[in-house]
Amino acid sequence: MAKFRASNILGDPFALATVSISILAWLIACIASIISDIKTDYPNYSWWAVAYMFCCIMGVTIVFGSDTGLVYGVAVVGYLSTGLVLTTLAVNSLVYADESSSQAAAAGFILMSMVIVVWIFYFGSSPQATHRGFIDSFALNKESSGAYGNRPMSTAYGPRPDTMSTSAPQMYTSAQLNGFETSSPVSGYPGGGPGSENRSSSQARFGNPSASNVAGNNSGQDEVPPPTEYPYKAKAIYSYDANPEDANEISFSKHEILEVSDVSGRWWQARKSNGETGIAPSNYLILL
């Protein structure tokens, strides 16, 4: 697991605010529950809600501090969903009590429930969600995710196939391929199949294609230009360093605006403001 850093919480306004409010709400509920238990018959069920929420708050604090929300997000949502049920039932058993201490405990549970709803909405959303990208944009250390280093999510997609090269394929015209046609549609050999009488004359059919190939390669009309339309715009929610072994990838910094031509795959064809083009992982970007 990644190392816990207090700066990940102090530098993230969302994490700092929600963790602080949850701790304050838990202290209110816990202290009020102790006082209520002394004065009246306090429901034992609510003590389990207090203990369970203590573990949940500590767990979420560790996730924020280690910046591993993308790794443990599903588990966090599951535990918080159970905590929301417990705090809601605790509120129902305390809010109608006559003692002010019981009502104060119910207020603490209500405040915790509100924070839980916000956390579930945050951790339950994908990194590409607009609201999550907006929240993460205020964090100072969010781009250097502790669980993944400088490239937090690139390993999630596995190896990228080599067929996604951005270079235009070499195209040939019928004039360039003159002499390469097969005269026998069955055998696929010029001049007929192996052993045919016309087999010996097949070399004459090829002629000297090297000259025509050179001329064809030099003519601009035979080349297919790379895509020039980039109808989408995306904002980088993390910094990304391109793999030095792959010339097709591009590097970009957090909050940088990129132009994107295709958003159907996991790797998007993008163009930077300086005109540099290449592919970028889609889970680092959010569409604008």
UniProtKB/Swiss-Prot annotation:
PROSITE patterns: SH3
Pfam families for this protein: SH3_1
Source species, domain of life: Eukaryota
Protein's job: Plasma membrane osmosensor that activates the high osmolarity glycerol (HOG) MAPK signaling pathway in response to high osmolarity. Regulates radial hyphal growth and germination. Involved in virulence and mediates resistance to oxidative stress.
InterPro entries in the cross-refs: SH3-like_dom_sf, SH3_domain, Sho1_SH3
Keywords for this protein: Cell membrane, Glycoprotein, Membrane, SH3 domain, Stress response, Transmembrane, Transmembrane helix
Family: Belongs to the SHO1 family.
Domain SH3 stretches: 229-288
Compartments, as annotated in UniProt: Cell membrane
Ranges for region Disordered: 183-230
Primary site of residence: membrane
Membrane topology (UniProt): Multi-pass membrane protein
SUPFAM superfamilies attached to this UniProt entry: SH3-domain (SSF50044)
GO BP terms, alphabetized: regulation of actin filament polymerization
Gene: sho1
Name this polypeptide is given: High osmolarity signaling protein sho1
Residues glycosylated per entry: 44
